[in-house]
A protein has these predicted regions:
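N-terminal anchoring/stem segment of glycosyltransferases
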Residues: 1-68, 72-83, 155
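Catalytic core and acceptor-binding pocket of nucleotide-sugar-dependent glycosyltransferases
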Residues: 139-258
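A structural signal for short, well-ordered beta-strand segments and their strand-loop junctions
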Residues: 34-36, 85-89, 94-95, 109-111, ...
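A short acidic (Asp/Glu
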Residues: 18-19, 44-48, 96-100, 161, ...
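Short N-terminal binding/cap micro-motifs at the start of the first secondary-structure element
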Residues: 14-18, 119, 257
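Juxtamembrane luminal stem/stalk of type II transmembrane Golgi/ER carbohydrate-processing enzymes
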Residues: 1-5, 266-274
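GT-A fold catalytic core of metal-dependent nucleotide-sugar glycosyltransferases
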Residues: 72-122, 148, 158
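Short, flexible, basic/aromatic active-site loop/helix in glycosyltransferases
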Residues: 125-141
C-alpha cells in the first residue's frame, strides 16, 4: 500500500494551539504525519505520541525554524518512500476532509491567495529585500502563492525543498542595520521563505506545477479570501459550493470564523471554546 505524509513544524507551540489541526486531520486521515518540535516541548510530545505522529526534536529556536524546517524535512525524507506529501503550517490550519482524497493536477501544487504581490506589503517586502527591485518588478503582477500549504509527489517536494534551501542560502534577507549589528533575526524577514517560494514558482524554476485559485481551489488561504461562505455543517465553501479540504489563516478573520470554528471544535471533541 502506498503511503502519504503530512509534514509540519511546531517548535515552541502549546498543545492547545495545535489541537484543532491534529484532531481535524486525524478525523479524516490515518496515514503518516510528522511534526518538528523543540526539545523542551514535552506536553506537545505526549499529545503527538497519543495521536501516532512521528516526532523530530530540534534545538533550533522558534524564531529560526521557519527557514531551517526545510533542511529538517529534507533529511527526514531520506530513505523514505511516499506517494504524495503535504508540507504545511500547523497552528493556523484545520481540515475539512482528507487532504489526499483529491485529484491534484500537478506533480507539485501551489495554492494562490487573492492579491497580487505588489498589493501586499509583506510579500512585496520579502521579495525586494531578498532578490532586489529588478527581480521584484518582473513578478510583482503575479498572484501571491502561499508557502504554508504545498502538495506534491515526493520527488517534486524534494526538488522544491532543495530549491528553497539553496535560495535561502544564496539570497539573504537584507536586515535592518540594528539587527545586522547585533546578529539578530529581523522580525520583518521571518516569513520570507514565502518570498523564495513565489520567486521559484513565478520565475518557473520548478516544472510540472499547478496553481489553484483561492476562490475555487481545494485549499482556502483566508487572509485575503474575498468571499466567506459556510454550509449548515459549519464547513467553509469555495465558489463551486464544495467544502474546502483545509482552511488556513482562519485566525486572521477570527470574527467571521469564531462561531463556526467553535462548532467544529465541539464536533471533534475539543471541549475548550475560544
Amino acid at each position: 500500500m502506498k503511503k502519504n505524509l503530512v509534514i509540519t513544524a511546531a517548535v515552541g507551540l502549546k498543545v492547545e494551539q495545535l489541537t484543532l489541526f491534529i484532531k481535524s486531520l486525524r478525523k479524516y486521515y490515518q496515514n503518516d504525519v510528522c511534526f518538528v518540535i523543540g526539545e523542551a516541548d514535552h506536553e506537545l510530545e505526549k499529545e503527538l505520541i497519543r495521536n501516532q505522529i512521528f516526532i523530530i526534536k530540534t534545538k533550533i529556536s522558534k524564531k529560526a525554524i521557519q527557514f531551517k524546517r526545510y533542511e529538517i524535512f529534507l533529511n527526514f525524507l531520506k530513505n523514505k518512500k511516499y506517494e504524495n506529501i503535504l508540507c504545511c503550517d500547523s497552528r493556523d490550519i484545520y481540515f475539512q476532509s482528507d487532504p489526499f482524497n483529491f485529484n491534484y493536477k500537478g506533480k507539485i501544487n501551489f495554492f494562490l491567495e487573492d492579491k497580487k504581490i505588489k498589493d501586499c506589503p509583506f510579500n512585496k517586502n520579502w521579495i525586494i529585500k531578498t532578490y532586489g527591485e529588478k527581480q521584484y518588478e518582473e513578478i510583482n503582477e503575479k498572484i501571491i502563492l502561499c508557502s504554508g500549504t504545498v502538495m506534491g509527489s515526493q520527488s517534486k517536494i524534494i526538488e522544491y525543498f532543495t530549491l528553497i534551501i539553496n535560495n535561502i542560502s544564496k539570497f539573504k534577507y537584507k536586515r535592518k542595520l540594528k539587527y545586522s549589528l547585533t546578529f539578530r533575526i529581523d522580525p520583518e524577514g521571518r516569513g520570507c521563505d514565502q518570498g523564495h517560494a513565489n520567486y521559484i514558482v513565478h520565475k518557473k524554476l520548478i516544472k510540472n506545477i499547478n496553481l489553484y485559485k483561492n476562490s475555487s481551489g481545494p485549499f482556502a488561504t483566508v487572509f485575503y479570501l474575498k468571499n466567506i461562505y459556510f454550509n449548515k455543517k459549519n464547513e467553509l465553501l469555495n465558489s463551486s459550493n464544495d467544502p474546502y479540504i483545509l482552511v488556513h489563516q482562519y485566525d486572521k478573520r477570527w470574527d467571521e470564523f469564531k462561531s463556526n470554528v467553535n462548532e467544529i471544535r465541539k464536533k471533534i471533541g475539543i471541549d475548550r471554546i475560544l
